[in-house]
Structures are given as structure tokens and as C-alpha cells.
Amino acid sequence: MKNRLYDATKIDWDNLMFSTKELWMLLIPIMVEQMLNSLMGMADTMMVSNVGSVAMSAVSLVDSINTLVIQVFAALATGAAIICSHYLGKGDEKGANKAARQIFLTVIVISLTITAGGLIFCRPLLRLIFGAVEPAVMENSIIYFLITASSYPFIALFNAGGAFYRAGGNSKFPMKISIISNVLNIIGNAVLIFGCNMGVAGAAISTLVSRAFCAIVVLYFLRKPKQKIVLNQYLTIRPDFPLIGKVLAIGIPAGVENGMFQFGKLAIQSTVSTLGTQAIAAQAMTVIFENVNGIAAIAVGIGLMTVAGQAFGAGRKEEAKYYIIKLTGYAEIVLIISCAVTFLISRPIMHLAGMEAESMELCYQMLIAITIAKPILWALSFIPPYGLRAAGDVKFSMITATCTMWFCRVALAVYLIRFQGFGPIAVWIGMFADWGIRSIIFSIRFLSGKWMEKHVI
């Protein structure tokens, strides 16, 4: 089996780039950071849910757009992590620092452009996507979107800065920033939502402040000289278009993949919005639980980009394949545990969130299906692609993910809801089909070895 998956004879087992201990030291802080990032969205939704289903639905709908935008920034961070990891793997810290400066410039320009567009076209955008929702939900959505859109540059800069630290093997520092940020967010929610009765506006302002804190802190500490990647003298940065092109060669396909994924979710969300406020609220909470039970496994994938990227940069292709297999196994283990734990705590959390009985029962039924299907299908469909991206095979991942998203997940969900009378469970039936087909396609791609013919730098 090892010879089929990787050539063990070409790996220097006495001089591995990452030991098992070092892998977990990299992965655990990323898991904590990702959990805290998810908790920020969960805190908004749960605390707003006590104001009522209208407010909860507004936050859920707008966060589906916010997630789309954040995924664009995550794609740029993916490019940052892979490019910088390759440079560091080959021992070229000067090249890594030069790339980091260009990534910073690119992130600033793109995030400010998206923010300006969001603020200008807020109302027509929301009416286009969620025109069928109740007027009260729409008004709350507009308020929440205008404020959270102002935080886009901050979250973009923090994502890029965190990617620089992780590329250098330091995943603890971004985690520490996230811990403080989430404490600020929860305190802000409590004060503004309940103390000042500001509803969705309070949740949005709290999110804005906490994201601004993250960006300011990470940019300040990137100026310190005693680390692998140093970023300072921001005003002296000038565009290096060939280098920006290398970053975008990774970032654009990853961004298109993430963007199409989120557009698909918006299409599904638009369909679910026709089922009424109870179904929207149930789906919103189910999405939160599904995000939570996959956080640890996603963190493994994020860590894999650094690990495989450095291995490829050092020219150790078989060792990179070994890490992809090993970390896919890690992801499966943490996925089984997190799905079980999330399911066990789901009912108390739904009660704590003040969900209405009908929404709660719908949510619980969907969560049962997710807890069974996700450990079987998810890991092979998502973790190996992180390794393929680290090798520069981003276009194949983009095409595959886009096709399975639209032709399986979206098409099946829309068909079942609009033509077969299904409720929100149709969303998850489509998702399970998507995961299953992805896992087959990416397994075949990995075994073919064609993905290792790509070049990053």
C-alpha cells in the first residue's frame, strides 16, 4: 500500500522535515484558532437569536455573503501560505519576505475595492439575493451588512498575516490573537446587544472592532526582525507584477473555487429562504453545528499546506505525499471525535440559544444525518486537495470542486425543495452527494501522480 501511495525508499526516515510531535504542535494551534473564528460567528447568531427569529435570520443570511467575501481573502491567504512555504522550504527567506510584501499590497487593494462595492450596492445586492424574505428580516440584514462589510480589509489583512506566520511554522501567534479577539467579540455582543439593546447592529459593531484588533496586532508584530517573515515599511512597497502573478496563479483558482462554493451556498440559501423563517432559523443553526464539527479537520488541511509546501520547496516530493496521507488520517480521527461531541451537545446549545420548538426539531433531524455521513465521506474529499494545492495543482481542484458543487449539491437541493416538496434536509442530501463524488475524483487524481508535475516558484 505504501508503494502505491508513496515511494518509501525515497524518503529519509531519519531526517524528516516534520516529526509527529512537530506536526501536532503546528496543527493544534490552528485547530484552536479555527474554532475561535467559528465561535465569533456562532456568538453573533446565538446571542442575536435571543432577540428573535427575525434578527437571527438576518444575521444568518448576511453571513452567507460575508463568508463568500472572506473566502476570497482566504484564497489569497492560501496563495500566501503556499508561495512562502515553498521559498522557506528551499531556504530562501529573502524570497519569502519579498513575496509577503507583494501579498500585503494585493490584499489591501482587493479588500478595499470589495468593501467599497459592498457599501455602495448594499440594498440592491441584498434585494437581488434575498428578495423573498420578510421586510423586517431585510431591514435587519441591511444594517448588519453595512457594518460588517466595513470589516473586510481587517479580516483580509489578518488572514494574510496569519498565513505568513503559519508558513514559517509559527501557528501559535495567530491563535493567541484569535483568543483575545473572541473575548472582545463576546464582551462587545453582551454590552451592545443586551446592555444597549442594539440588536443586529450591536453584533455587527462588535465583530468590526474585534477584526480591526486582529489586523492591527498582526501587522504590528510582523515588523519584528527575529522571525522568518518580516513585513515593515509598508509605504515603500511597490508592485512587482511577475511575483504578484505567481501569487495570483495560486490565489485566483483557489478564489474561484471558494467563490463558486459560496455562490452555490447562496443559491441554496435563497431556495431555503422560500421555506419560511422557521426553516431558515433551523438551517442557520444546523450550518453552525456542521461548521463546528468540521473545524479540526479543516485545520489539518490548512496545516498540510505549510507542511507539504515546505517539503515540495525542498524537493522532497515523496515525503510530501507521505504527509498528505498521514494528515488525511489525522483529519479522519479528529472528524469522528468532533462529530460525536457536537451531536451530544447540540440539544443543550439549541435550548440555550432560545430556538423555537419547530426549528429545533428540524435542526436535530438534519444533524443526525450529518453526524452519520460526514465521517464517512468528508476527509478524502477535502484533505488531499490541500496537498494538491500545495504542489500548485490548483486548477484541477477548482474545476472539480465547482462542477460537483453546482451539478450535485446545488442542483439536487434545488430540485428536491422546489419540485419534490422537501424541507431543508434537501440541502444536506445534495451535500452528501457532492462529498462522495469529490472523494472519488480526488483519490484518482492523487494516485495518478500528475499533480506533482506542477511548479509554484
Please name every model-derived segment.
Residues 1-27, 84-151, 195-252, 308-374, ...:
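Short alpha-helical transmembrane segments in multi-pass integral membrane proteins
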Residues 14-46, 50-51, 67-79, 83, ...:
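N-terminal transmembrane alpha-helices
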Residues 25, 48-67, 135-140, 200-201, ...:
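Interfacial/gating helices of multi-pass transporter permease domains
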Residues 25-44, 147, 181, 210-214, ...:
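Transmembrane helical elements of multi-pass membrane transporters/channels
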Residues 30, 34, 45-46, 82, ...:
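Transmembrane alpha-helix boundary and packing residues in multipass membrane permease domains
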Residues 35, 39-57, 126-135, 191-198, ...:
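Helix-terminus/linker motif at the lipid-water interface of multi-pass membrane proteins
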Residues 56-116, 155-174, 280-346, 378-401:
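Small-residue-rich hydrophobic transmembrane alpha-helices
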Residues 77, 147-166, 174-182, 203-218, ...:
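Short runs within selected transmembrane alpha-helices of multi-pass transporters and secretion channels
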